[in-house]
Design a protein with these regions (language model features):
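A short N-terminal helical cap/helix-turn-helix that marks the beginning
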Residues: 315-316
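Acidic/proline- and glycine-rich, intrinsically disordered low-complexity segments
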Residues: 305-308
Length: 323
């Protein structure tokens, strides 16, 4: 029984989780840094616990402090929101090992989908179309990497396996720049993500960015809630989301929806998630999966009438959501 939930985040998403909990009759505990003691979600929560100083590394990214807050307040579950520890498999694992419910996917699923190379392999096995690419991390053999790029066809894009949020990517237009770009991306990936593995894909020059929202319970039941168009971006960061996506036919929506549902079943997914695609010349190409609630989730809520955060809570509590 989820009688009390730790909200391990701040700002808008913390208020969003608090509202869903309140409407379901679930008590809330806001964890916060010393700088955030007077934020609205802290003042509105049933309880609050200070977990550290303003620096995120010592508060909102401090796993022991968050778990200790759950123990101190006798909470049943932890909702990570988005950002911070929401896609940290180690955190999800530690939460469950400590006897609490992690409101999100299983740790192994987060780990599996967080590695872009692993995620692409799984999607291919599930019949989801992917961008033509290396299909595996690039090795140190320069001749082999040049061969792979030639086979794919320039321009190509070098991506960090552990990257995300529009970071860890470099477009290469010719063979002369390839090897230097691979080395620079490796170094940046190691510094930013602690993982220097990179892979290569065909660079689509004029794609749209389309993402499909999914919900999955503990019993293998998966539904998709249609797509959002997030093509309007600046520096690979989304600026505007629109749903339904203009120009996507009902046949395309149903076809891709079936594929993403099957892919989620294949990996044993649970909770809310989003599969992201590039769309060009009438074709979809998988690029990554977000194993959390997204900033943009209200766009889907407005066109479906489904409260995604409530659904997350119900899935965590009883294993399924009534939507």
């Amino acid at each position: 029984m989820l009688d009390k939930v730790i909200i391990a985040n701040r700002g808008e998403i913390a208020l969003r989780v608090l509202r869903a909990c309140r409407e379901l009759g679930i008590k809330t505990v806001a964890v916060h840094s010393t700088a955030d003691a007077n934020l609205k979600h802290v003042l509105l929560a049933d309880e609050s616990v200070c977990i550290g100083p303003p620096l995120s590394a010592k508060s909102y990214l401090n796993m022991p402090s968050i778990i200790a807050a759950a123990e101190l307040t006798d909470a049943a579950a932890i909702h990570p929101g988005y950002g911070f520890l929401s896609e940290n498999a180690d955190f999800a694992e530690r939460v469950e090992q400590s006897g609490f419910v992690f409101i999100g996917p299983k740790a192994e699923t987060i780990r599996m989908m967080g590695d872009k190379v692993s995620a692409i392999r799984i999607m291919k096995e599930a019949g989801v179309p992917c961008v033509p690419g290396s299909g595996a991390p690039l090795g140190l053999d320069n001749d082999e990497n040049l061969r792979i790029a030639k086979e794919i066809g320039y321009p190509v894009i070098i991506k960090a396996s552990g990257g995300g949020g529009g970071r860890g990517m470099r477009v290469v237009h010719n063979a002369a720049a390839l090897l230097h770009s691979i080395n620079v991306t490796r170094s940046e990936a190691l510094a930013a993500f602690g993982n220097d593995q990179v892979y290569m894909e065909k660079f689509l020059e004029k794609p749209r960015h389309i993402e499909f929202q999914v919900l999955a319970d503990h019993h293998g039941n998966v539904i998709h809630l249609g797509e959002r168009d997030c093509s309007m971006q600046r520096r690979h960061q989304k600026v505007i989301e629109e749903a339904p996506a203009p120009g996507i036919t009902s046949e395309q929506r149903e076809m891709m929806g079936e594929r993403v549902v099957e892919a989620c079943r294949k990996v044993g997914y649970r909770s809310a998630g989003t599969l992201e695609f590039l769309y060009q010349d009438g074709e979809f190409y998988f690029i990554e999966m977000n194993t959390r609630i997204q900033v943009e989730h209200p766009v889907t809520e407005l066109i479906t009438g489904i409260d995604l955060v409530k659904a997350q809570l119900m899935i965590a509590e009883i294993g399924r959501a009534h939507v």
